[in-house]
């Protein structure tokens, strides 16, 4: 299962509302090959993502060329008036129903990754949801499983120990309040787990404005955002970008046209520790 090709950067679709389909089309046409969404109508138009993907599938782009990732969002994260599954059903059935809704919304027969949007109220409930996701994995409905919004290393370690299908992805907000998940990122790297970052730019205006980043941006004729994204990708992190700007889409994909030197990466790393 974990042999799935790792995307280098992912287009995120939260909060796009009725612009979702058009933005997904633009992202794919500019070159994004990984899309993140969620079965959570409160913040995502998952069906719009599916329609956008379908519009891009052609003789030159197959479903297999795309990495499609969605999430099971627990009841606590749903709009009670728009929950995409029966909130009164047993938890395992909620996961199954949400997954079926996602396949329908995304017009696909499988997911590249199914992510638990957040840990549940306690470890027992989280394990129950994970077992339901493992059943989906067993049936080849999801090629990988992951967890998001998991900032407690001990919690992640316990899930990893107990899981029969190990987490292949951890997707967390990348910000100073959690120390940029230093320990979690080490844990992931040691176990071949892909660490995905979100809010990478939004939560870090101080990094983007720092003179170290500004100097690197000037040296490489890039933007501060490109410097931060490139640093992270060279560290093995897969960033999400939810930009609505086509110019920024192009810039985000252009980060792989240059590389930071080792001493430059150390300088940026020092900023994350300060």
Identify the residue ranges that each predicted region occupies.
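N-terminal binding-site loop/beta-alpha segment at the start of enzyme catalytic domains
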Residues: 1-66, 70, 128, 203
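Short, acidic/polar
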Residues: 16-28, 88-105, 153-157, 180
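Acidic (Asp/Glu)-rich catalytic clusters
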Residues: 26-29, 50-67, 103-108, 135-137, ...
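A structural motif
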Residues: 32, 108-111, 142, 167
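Hydrophobic residues within beta-strands of alpha/beta enzymes
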Residues: 35, 111-114, 145, 170
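Structural motif corresponding to the early beta-alpha repeats
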Residues: 64-92, 117
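Active-site groove signature of glycoside hydrolases
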Residues: 104-123
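Beta/alpha (TIM)-barrel catalytic core signal, keyed to glycine-rich beta->alpha loops juxtaposed to Asp/Glu
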Residues: 118-274
């Amino acid at each position: 299962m974990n042999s799935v090709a790792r995307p280098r950067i992912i287009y995120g679709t939260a909060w796009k509302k009725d612009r979702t389909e058009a933005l997904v089309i633009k992202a794919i046409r500019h070159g994004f090959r990984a899309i993140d969404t969620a079965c959570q109508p409160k913040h995502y138009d998952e069906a719009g993502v599916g329609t956008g993907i379908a519009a891009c599938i052609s003789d030159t782009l197959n479903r297999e060329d795309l990495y499609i990732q969605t999430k099971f969002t627990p009841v606590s994260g749903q709009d009670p008036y728009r929950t995409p599954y029966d909130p009164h059903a047993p938890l395992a059935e909620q996961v199954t129903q949400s997954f079926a809704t996602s396949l329908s919304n995304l017009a696909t027969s499988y997911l590249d990754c199914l992510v638990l949007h957040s840990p549940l109220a306690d470890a027992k409930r989280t394990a129950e949801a994970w077992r339901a996701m493992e059943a989906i994995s067993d049936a080849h409905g999801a090629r990988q499983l992951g967890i998001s919004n998991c900032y407690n290393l001990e919690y992640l370690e316990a899930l990893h120990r107990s899981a029969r299908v190990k987490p292949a992805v951890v997707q967390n907000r990348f910000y100073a309040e959690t120390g940029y998940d230093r320990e979690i990122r080490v844990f992931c790297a040691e176990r071949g787990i892909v660490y995905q970052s979100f809010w990478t730019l939004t939560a870090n205006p101080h990094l983007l404005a720092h003179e170290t980043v500004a100097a690197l941006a000037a040296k490489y004729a890039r933007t501060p955002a490109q410097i931060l994204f490139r640093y992270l990708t060279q560290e093995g992190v897969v960033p999400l970008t939810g930009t609505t700007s086509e110019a920024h889409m192009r810039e985000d994909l252009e980060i792989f046209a240059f590389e930071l030197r080792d001493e430059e990466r150390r300088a940026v790393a020092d900023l994350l520790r300060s």
